[in-house]
Every structure is written in C-alpha cells, then in structure tokens.
A protein has these predicted regions:
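Conserved alpha-helical substructure of the radical SAM core
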Residues: 3-121, 125, 333-335, 344-345
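Short, charged low-complexity linear segments at domain edges
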Residues: 7-27, 247-254, 290-307
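Secreted/processed peptides and extracellular or luminal domains of membrane proteins
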Residues: 44, 48-51, 273, 291, ...
Length: 345
C-alpha cells in the first residue's frame, strides 16, 4: 500500500508539472556546464574545448540561479565537472527535484568527496553518472589508457554512500557495438541503479567514430531492453515500471528519429529546456549554436530576445532533429500521447 501511495504521488506530481507547463510555460530543465576543463579528450566527445577556458564564476552562476531556479532537472555538464573546486557550492545555488552530475571517473577521491557532500544536502535527489563505454581495452581506447580501472574504482566507492543513486552512461557507436550486450550484463552485475545508452551524436573529436547501422541498432534493441528491465532505477513499485517502459519508448523514438530524419515527438528545446555553457553562452540545446551570453545580457533578456524566438520557432517547425537523451527525456514525459506506452497499456 505504501509503495502504491508513493507511486501515485509521484505520478500526480509529474502530471501536475505537465499541466502547469501547459498553462504557464517556464524553464524546468537547466543544463549547466560548470567548466570547460577536462583531463581527457575522448574520441567520441562532441564538446568544443577552448584553449584557454574562461569559466563562469560562482557569482555569475548565482545570477543564473536568481533568474531560473524552480527546476525539475538540473543537469551539470562540462568538461569534467569534479575539476571545479566549488562544485558543491554551485549545486547549492539551485532548487531542483533531480540533480545529475556526470564524470569520467578519473578522480575517485575527489568525486566521492563532492558526491557525498552534495548528497548529504540533497538526499534522494542526486544521481552521479559514471562513463563506461565498453570492456577495458575498448573503453581505454575510446577515452584514455587507465581510465577503465579508475572509473571502476569510482563506481565502487560511490556505491558505498547510502542512498546515493549511481548510474553508468555508455555511448553506443560502431567501436563498441560488437560487445555491447555482454558489456551491459557486466554493468548490471556491478550493482549500479541503472545504465543509460546514449547514441553517438554531434561531431566527434575523431571523425572515424560513427553510429552502428540502423539494422544493427534494430537487432540489438530487444536484447538491450531485456537487460535494462533487470534494473530498479533506484525506484520502487509503480514508478519503477514506468521508468522501464520509458527506456523502451525512448529507444524506439530515437531510432524512428534517425530513420525518418525528423522529430517523432515534438521537441521542447528552448521552451522547457535551456543550456548555459561554462563561458556564459546560452543555447536552446546542446546541438544548436548559442544565441546569446549572460556575460553580455541578463539571462531573461537572452531568453526573450528575437534570436532566441527564431531558434525556438525553428525547433517547433522541426527544422532540426536529434536523439539527445536530455531532450528526449522531457519531450516524452511532457507529451500525453506517450502516456499509454509509459503506463504499459
């Protein structure tokens, strides 16, 4: 009974978010790149690193928090976020129902310390996502020699923090597609809360990295979903089953997007979703170019500018399409047409 009540409350909260957004649209999802510094140059990374990073100060980020703060999702990005020494203070500036921080796992001590500090103030809301792209040889080739073992140690230590949700992100590309199913079973046995499969996107540092063929992705899909169904996603009862269904809906939506070369579910980029980069530039999503900077204008001026409106109009007209997980999440959850599938009907 208690689990059913928790599930019902969660569903009602999500439905309330959707209704409020439809009545009065507002930004509920912020991707905040806290640093452009990274200790790796992963072969499949799409981030355009600056030679001389000029990261936002804590005061400048506080200005962002003062203008956009009542969030469902706060996604921290980079660079390698844990290289920012005041990361915990940055997170403290925001009110968010769910906080997600990715890491390449290279610094187990530093990551575990900051995760523990943030989790203590945000119990049940923090997810630490560690990147693992394949077994050791594959992962180290795609990222950096020795990175597999360090990421593995980071996962082990994070799992020792009671109540902290730990996730693995895996970029799916030709290089790891041959071992992906066995690797997914390996990750499941690590005891993490779940694994996200991210289709390669953007313009990788190494242009030889590409997506597997559509036939390969279709063949892998059912077996992948069967493995993902073994996770509880850090949840219980009804909402756990919804999250399992979501993985299947997301995968099918992404494949159809690639096949049709258009948006399958209308994209809310620039409407519910905003990206602030470490240098202050602002974009409607990580795929499209920036259209302003908080170092030149207050954030609200950027978000109400003619340039921003033009970018959003282009998204609404389906002038662009992508498989970006961060976008697909809100697109699916805020589209009532997906609810029958999410509920398993």
């Amino acid at each position: 009974m208690a689990i059913q009540q928790v599930g019902a409350r969660t569903v009602l909260k999500v439905l309330g978010d959707v209704v409020r957004y439809r009545i009065s649209p507002s930004f509920r999802h912020l991707i905040l790149h806290v640093t452009n510094i990274c200790n790796m140059r992963c072969q499949h990374c799409f981030v355009d690193f600056e030679e001389k990073p000029n990261d936002l100060s804590l005061e400048e980020i506080a200005g962002v928090a003062g203008e956009i703060n009542d969030l469902i999702w706060l996604d921290i990005g980079g660079g390698e976020p844990c290289l920012r020494k005041d990361l915990a203070e940055v997170v403290d500036l925001f009110r968010a129902r769910e906080i997600s921080i990715p890491t390449n796992g290279w610094f187990p001590d530093r990551i575990t310390k900051v995760a523990g500090a943030i989790h203590e103030k945000n119990p049940g809301r923090l997810i630490i996502t560690v990147s693992l792209d394949g077994f050791e040889a594959t992962h180290d080739e795609m990222r950096q020699k020795g990175s597999f073992q360090r990421a593995h140690e980071t996962i082990r230590r994070l799992r020792e923090i009671p109540g902290l949700r730990v996730k693995v992100n895996t970029v799916v590309c030709e290089r790891n597609s041959g071992e992906i199913l066995d690797f997914m079973r390996y990750v499941r046995d690590l005891g993490v809360d779940y694994q996200s499969l991210l289709l390669l996107r953007g313009n990788p540092i190494n242009p030889l990295y590409r997506l597997p063929s559509m036939d390969s992705l279709r063949r892998l899909g059912e077996a992948m979903q069967h493995i993902l169904d073994g996770y509880d996603f850090g949840r219980k009862g009804f909402f756990r089953s919804v999250l399992r269904n979501y993985q299947a809906v997301k995968w099918e939506t992404q494949l159809q997007t690639l096949e049709r070369e258009t948006q399958v579910v209308p994209c809310l980029g620039g409407q519910i979703h905003v990206v602030v980069y470490a240098n202050g530039e602002v974009a409607p999503c990580e795929i499209l170019p920036p259209v302003g900077s908080i170092r030149k204008s207050p954030l609200k001026e950027v978000l109400t500018s003619a340039e921003w409106k033009d970018a959003v109009d282009g998204i609404r007209r389906k002038a662009c399409h992508c498989t970006h997980d961060c976008n697909q999440q809100e697109n699916i959850l805020f589209d009532p047409r997906t609810y029958s599938k999410l509920l398993g009907f």
